[in-house]
């Protein structure tokens, strides 16, 4: 979504605590020097690159010693709930995920008090803390009026096919990075079928060595899953004239025409230009 004209996207995240790979590990596998970029420069990159990743350990250092303990537990804790609420970059609109539908309304009410203009809180029916690729997702929609509307959406509402959770399961950070790089570099070669053999990806974005994408991976499922999240964010930001399917087309176009790749290159170059030694 960061490659779409008029969009400025700030993702706040860290390392995995309950899954094989978090967004932080994925991006570091693609060469982003997250542990070497001062927090104030991470915020600046939003304006230089139209997108940024706010690496939680660089903003909330007091919580760093807890990371190994959280990872060893293997289930969500209070800190999984707290994370999105302490995003260091204040925004007027946003997409937030919770791992339990019981948290949806509470989360929505809390975020409303923080002064957001318009946002969604989502929970996949299976307990995903994002929109489900497989079926219904619960949505709590809140605007400045303070009214909370609760409804469900499915991939079909976005004009996308459904995919099982098994088809979009996470690999290692390096494998996930290879999938993302392949989608950005070769969007025209993505096929809706499991890979018959491991796929090696040459990543000229960062000149890093990535693990091959495992045989059996359905890249079209991963692609649709990614587009689903981006389309929701575009809708929340006011794109697509209030049409979810049009937002899907916008997200797909930004990948197909290279704008998403260009945004990634800008972010990579900026972070390397400001990293500390």
Protein language model regions, located:
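Active-site-proximal loop->helix
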Residues: 16-33
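Active-site cofactor/substrate anionic-group-binding motifs, chiefly glycine-
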Residues: 1-13, 17
């Amino acid at each position: 979504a960061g490659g779409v004209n008029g969009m400025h996207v700030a993702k706040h995240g860290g390392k995995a605590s309950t899954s094989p790979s978090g967004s932080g590990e994925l991006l570091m596998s693609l060469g982003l020097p997250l542990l070497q970029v001062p927090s104030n420069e991470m915020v600046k990159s939003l304006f230089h690159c139209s997108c940024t990743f706010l690496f939680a350990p660089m903003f909330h250092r007091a919580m760093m010693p807890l990371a190994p303990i959280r990872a060893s537990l293997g289930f969500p804790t209070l800190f999984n709930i707290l994370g999105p609420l302490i995003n260091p970059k204040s925004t007027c609109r946003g997409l937030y995920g919770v791992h339990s539908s019981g948290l949806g309304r509470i989360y929505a009410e809390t975020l409303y008090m923080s002064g957001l203009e318009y946002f969604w809180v989502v929970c996949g029916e299976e307990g995903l803390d994002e929109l489900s690729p497989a079926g219904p997702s619960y949505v709590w929609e809140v605007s400045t009026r303070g009214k909370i509307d609760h409804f469900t959406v499915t991939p079909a509402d976005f004009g996308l096919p459904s995919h099982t959770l098994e088809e979009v399961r996470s690999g290692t950070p390096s494998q996930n990075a290879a999938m993302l790089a392949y989608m950005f570099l070769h969007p025209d070669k993505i096929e809706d079928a499991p890979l018959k053999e491991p796929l090696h990806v040459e990543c000229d974005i960062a000149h890093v060595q990535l693990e091959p994408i495992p045989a059996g991976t359905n890249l079209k499922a991963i692609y649709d899953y990614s587009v689903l999240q981006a389309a929701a964010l575009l809708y929340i930001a006011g794109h697509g004239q209030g049409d979810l399917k049009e937002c899907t087309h916008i997200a797909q176009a930004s990948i197909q025409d290279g704008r998403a790749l260009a945004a990634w290159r800008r972010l990579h170059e900026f972070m390397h230009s400001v990293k500390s030694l």
